[in-house]
Amino acid sequence: MQRPHRRQSQMDAASTRAPPRPSAPQQGRRQPSMPGSAQCHHRPDPHPPAPGKKKSSPVGRFFPASAMAPPWLPGIVSAAQLKPVLSDLPPHCTRAQCQPLTQRPHSLHLQDSRNASSLPHKGWRCNFPLQGPAGLTHKSACVGRMGHCCGSAGNVPELSPRPASPRGQQVTQDGPLQTPELPSECNVGPVMSRQPFPEQSQQGECAIDPRGPPRLELSWGEDPLSGV
C-alpha cells in the first residue's frame, strides 16, 4: 500500500514530469540510479566489459609477438652481445666466407649463435676456402656479421696447418721444378717431331699431285682415242 502513496506524491510534485516518472520507479526497481535511459544503459552495461575483454585480447595477442621480438632485435642490433660471444669463440673459430642460404640478410638468431649446431640449419653455413672433411660444413656455424666460422676443436686445427705449411710449401717447390721441365720437354720433343711431319707431308703431296692428274687425263683421253 505504500507504493501507490509514493506514486501519487511524485505525480503531485510535478505534473509535467508525470509521464517519465511512472517509468522511473518501475525501472528504478532494476537500477534506480538511471531514471530515464535506464533501459538503454542496463543492457549495454554488462556488455562493455565483454568488448573490453575482446579489446584486451587482441592486445594480448600482440604482446606475445612483441615479447618474442625484443629478444631477437637486441641480439641483432646490440654489439655488446657480439663481443662476449666473439671473445669466447676465437680459439675455436676461423674467419671464412659465410653465405646466407635464405633471403634474410640478418644473421639469424644470434642468441643461438652460441649453439654452433643450430645456425647452419637456420640459413647460414660456412664455406671454408680450403675444403676439408665433409663434416665441417655441418658442424661449422657463422657467428654474427663478422663472418666467423666455428666448428669443433678437432676440425678447425686441421684447416689451419693445411693451407699454411703443407700445401703452401708443396706448391712453391713443385711449381718452379716442374715448370722448367715441362716447357723444355713439350717445346723440344713435339716441335722436332712435328716439324718433319708437315714438311714430309707437303713434299709427298707435291710429288704425288703432278704425277697423278696427267696419268688420269692421259688415261681418260688416250683410251677412247686409241680404242677408236
Swiss-Prot record:
Low complexity biased stretches: 13-33
Region Disordered, residue ranges: 1-62, 160-228
Comp. bias (Polar residues): 167-176
UniProt superkingdom: Eukaryota
Protein name: Putative uncharacterized protein ENSP00000401716
